[in-house]
């Protein structure tokens, strides 16, 4: 299962690959044309000062030696240890050259088998022309493919808002129904169980729902199932979510500031913020009110708000009130107005982290 997930990540990184993305180089030479075909997508809406490079397998030894040398001096690797590559890196004024996916000691063999260890992220001067940088690197024999670090955009810029205290009262018929769980707002979740109550929604139509009531008769969740929410951060302290959060026990019981479980990430208690490379956040906004919208928490609630606990709403797989809901792993790929939010690199790291740490969905 996880092997397939890792291969899927590799496929996603090369999903835009095509044979005619770019035309001949400026000199019209066939060598430039062949080199440009290593570039698998376009620079439209790409992160400035960033490229994802897939190196030839023969180059990895030198890259890893250069990384080890930098680590010994507690510095950041900026060169590959390969003359032809380093000439270009120097020209681009590269400030960091790191593996896209940090070493997870538990899964490194699987990672290497899938070829994911060959992906590196380059950071360089944001004033450098991305297309020119990609063209220069693509001409190097040790470079197999190049991908622009595309920025993904949220489909919705609104805010998740709490239920209004003055929400319309439900009809007597709706109030008199015996509901499967005692969460007070389940009655308003018409998309779960639609009784056709016009007081809940003017367009309510009985039976127009997801049939969750029948599903709950089979199961309301399973704590062995981990669901990764790749979104904004999840408010893991929320009273209707806290008990259903995935917990990285080795980090939780380990030493602060140390990667206790060897998965490549430090203090990832409930997941990780792949944008800021730090703690999960869910309420970061700027002075204009732009930033986190609460969507990650909203999504987590739809999946696994705790059922039958007498508060809030129900989750589709939130359990029956016996600590039997699925577990939510927060893989934060959108973070306020932070630079790098929602890029291909961030999304790829989030997906691989989920696979490496046991997420099923």
Residue locations for each model-derived region?
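Inhibitory N-terminal propeptides of secreted protease zymogens
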Residues: 27-171, 214
């Amino acid at each position: 299962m996880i092997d397939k997930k890792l291969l899927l990540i590799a496929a996603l990184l090369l999903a835009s690959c095509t044979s005619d993305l770019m035309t001949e180089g400026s000199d019209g030479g066939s060598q430039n044309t062949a080199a440009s075909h290593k570039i698998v997508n376009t620079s439209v809406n790409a992160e400035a000062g960033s490229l994802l490079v897939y190196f030839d397998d023969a180059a990895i030894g030198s890259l890893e030696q250069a990384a080890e040398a930098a680590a010994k001096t507690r510095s950041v690797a900026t060169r590959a240890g390969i003359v032809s590559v380093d000439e270009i890196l120097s020209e681009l004024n590269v400030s960091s050259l790191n593996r896209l996916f940090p070493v997870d000691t538990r899964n490194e063999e699987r990672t290497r088998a899938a070829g994911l260890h060959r992906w590196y992220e380059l950071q360089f001067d944001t004033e450098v022309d991305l297309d020119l940088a990609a063209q220069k690197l693509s001409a190097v024999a040790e470079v197999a493919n190049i991908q622009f670090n595309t920025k993904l955009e949220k489909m919705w810029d609104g805010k998740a808002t709490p239920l209004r205290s003055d929400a319309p009262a439900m009809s007597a018929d709706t109030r008199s129904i015996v509901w499967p769980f005692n969460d007070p707002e389940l009655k308003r979740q018409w998309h779960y169980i639609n009784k056709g109550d016009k007081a809940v929604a003017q367009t309510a139509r009985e039976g127009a729902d997801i049939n969750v009531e029948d599903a709950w008769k089979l199961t309301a969740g399973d704590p062995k199932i981990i669901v990764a929410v790749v979104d904004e951060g999840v408010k893991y302290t929320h009273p209707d979510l806290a008990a259903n959060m995935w917990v990285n026990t080795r980090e939780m019981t380990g030493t602060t500031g140390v990667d206790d479980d060897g998965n490549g990430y430090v203090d990832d208690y409930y997941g990780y913020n792949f944008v800021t490379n730090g703690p999960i956040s869910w309420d970061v906004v700027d002075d204009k009110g732009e930033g986190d919208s609460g969507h990650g928490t909203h999504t987590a609630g739809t999946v696994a708000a705790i059922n039958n606990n007498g508060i809030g709403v129900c989750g589709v797989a939130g359990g029956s009130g016996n600590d039997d809901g699925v577990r939510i792993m927060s893989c934060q790929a959108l973070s306020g107005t932070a630079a790098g939010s929602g890029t291909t690199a961030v999304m790829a790291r989030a997906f691989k982290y989920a696979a490496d740490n046991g997420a099923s969905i």
